[in-house]
């Protein structure tokens, strides 16, 4: 689930009426905006949209025309919401470049990925506030927005429930079995992961059991096509499938993932600042890792550089050496005190807590 989905679920659980607009997808429906009647969730109305014809071209070459076309979408969405929107939480400035068209009482622009372009700048200017999980984005756009909020990623309730139980029971196992298990979650066909480093790490550590969760094929993958899933990613995936000490779990539900990750002794985060859309400055998976309490061996992550929650390295060589050192000293790195520190941080950033922070922020606007 994406952050916006977790936020929608949490808001609905609080009794708010949420109108969740899906990303545009082609369908046989004659309308370009319509309610998805196939999904029934209390307090949530799912709204499907279809792509604007030649939308990318129009957005960049004829922004005025695109703005008029997308206005019809906003008008229909607002009508479905009863022609009254208290708060618009916009996560998609690539499509909705003029959020004021919705006529919401408050408009919040959430930039969780570092999108660039004049259309994003325009959306920032129209928003009442800008919210992001990384200062990389805020530093670039905050002059264009009015107030802004740096907000960490949220932790899903499935992870939080297990973390709270572990704190309650003082359940801080250093190592789950004789063979050390190291975990990684994420789309293996998305650019961003340092696959060269990951391959070297796996080859140099045959004594370690590596576990990967997430999409591991083009089918049912949220990568839009082979053009995004480069040959490098596909070659890396084939390498993983052929490695005897690698376990591929595929896609799991949030609840399943939260349970299965508890069996790990350590986690790795190895993104490339050159290929990751957010310059490897943050990731929601880190918060999920932290909720298990187990040590995280990572490349540089700017949003965590000052809190000592990750064991970070400056370059590939240092990462490999750090990995060896940490695994040889799990008693130290997975001590009860270290695990509790990580879990406490994760529990301070549940989606429930983030919504409370957003609500306090909105009251200042």
What is each stretch, according to the model?
Residues 2, 255-260, 267-290, 297-308:
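Nucleotide-sugar-dependent
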Residues 167, 332-364:
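A charged, aromatic-enriched C-terminal amphipathic alpha-helix characteristic of glycosyltransferases
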Residues 173-193, 199-202, 210-213, 347:
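Conserved donor-binding/catalytic core segment of Leloir-type glycosyltransferases
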């Amino acid at each position: 689930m994406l952050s916006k989905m977790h936020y929608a679920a949490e808001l609905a659980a609080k009794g708010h009426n949420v109108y969740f607009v899906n990303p545009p997808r082609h369908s046989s429906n004659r309308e370009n905006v319509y309610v998805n009647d196939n999904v029934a969730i209390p307090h949530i109305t799912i709204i499907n949209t279809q792509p604007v014809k030649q939308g990318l071209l129009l957005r960049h070459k004829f922004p005025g025309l695109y703005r008029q076309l997308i206005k019809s979408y906003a008008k229909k969405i607002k009508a479905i919401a009863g022609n009254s929107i208290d708060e618009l939480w916009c996560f998609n400035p690539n499509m909705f470049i003029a959020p004021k068209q919705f006529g919401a009482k408050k408009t919040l622009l959430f930039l969780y990925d570092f999108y660039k372009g004049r259309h994003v700048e325009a959306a920032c200017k129209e928003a009442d506030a800008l919210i992001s999980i990384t200062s990389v984005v805020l530093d670039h756009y905050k002059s264009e927005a009015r107030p802004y909020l740096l907000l960490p990623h949220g932790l899903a309730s499935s992870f939080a429930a297990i973390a709270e139980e572990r704190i309650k029971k003082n359940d801080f196992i250093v190592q789950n079995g004789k063979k050390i298990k190291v975990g990684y979650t994420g789309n293996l066909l998305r650019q961003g992961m340092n696959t060269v480093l990951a391959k070297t790490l796996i080859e140099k550590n045959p004594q370690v059991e590596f576990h990967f969760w997430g999409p591991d094929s083009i089918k049912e993958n949220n990568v839009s096509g082979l053009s995004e899933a480069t040959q490098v990613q596909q070659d890396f995936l084939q390498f993983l499938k052929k490695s005897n000490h690698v376990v591929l779990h595929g896609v799991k539900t949030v609840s399943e993932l939260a349970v299965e990750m508890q069996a790990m002794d350590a986690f790795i985060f190895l993104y490339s600042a050159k290929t990751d859309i957010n310059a490897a400055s943050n990731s929601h998976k880190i918060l999920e890792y932290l909720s298990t309490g187990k040590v995280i061996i990572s490349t540089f992550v700017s949003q965590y550089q000052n809190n000592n929650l990750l064991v970070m390295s400056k370059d590939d060589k240092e990462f490999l050496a750090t990995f060896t050192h940490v695994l040889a000293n799990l008693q130290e790195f997975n001590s009860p005190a270290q695990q509790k520190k990580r879990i406490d941080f994760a529990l301070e950033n549940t989606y429930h807590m983030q919504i409370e922070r957003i609500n306090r922020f909105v009251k200042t606007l």
